[in-house]
Amino acid sequence: SAHVLKLINHVFDAEPGDGAVGVTALLARGRLVLLADTLVQEWPTENDLADIATRAADVAKNLGLEPRVAFCSFSNFGYPVSERAIKMSRASAVLDERGVDFEYDGEMTVDVALNPEVMKHYPFCRLTGPANILVMPARHSASISIKLLQELGHVTVIGPILTGIDRQVKLCSTNSSVNDILHMAIMAACKVG
């Protein structure tokens, strides 16, 4: 990923800096969910995670969605306790300090984030409905999640959409299908990212 960003910087004279984020769109059962960061930040800090959430929220707004961000973890709102889970919770606190204009909460498991029946067990959760943006704790967990969903099928994966750089850049891997390339071309035409 760092190599790809370096090449993009070389070709476009863009300055990706700390703001670059990879957002991947997942289409399944009539729902659109964005997953981030799928490309850039290997081990993001809580401030990085807040930046990732903000960039992903911008992509969601660009797609006509009202952003609802879940900071994902293996724990829910402090239980069980771990260093990585605390980092996800602190990212939510960073957004509190920034006063952003979209919904967010966490840390929470993916089932709590996406399933309203499970979310009901956490009445203090600030999301008004299922999350449409999942911020993952690290790039590897985001990548594993996407590859798993792709291999199991019944999910259309679009991305990663590189956002936070000076130019529109869309990336396709060497194993991209014709549909993958078409989806990215549509995203480019709609100036998403």
Regions found by a protein language model. Give the residues of each.
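Anion-binding alpha/beta catalytic cores of soluble intermediary-metabolism enzymes, centered on
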Residues: S1-G193
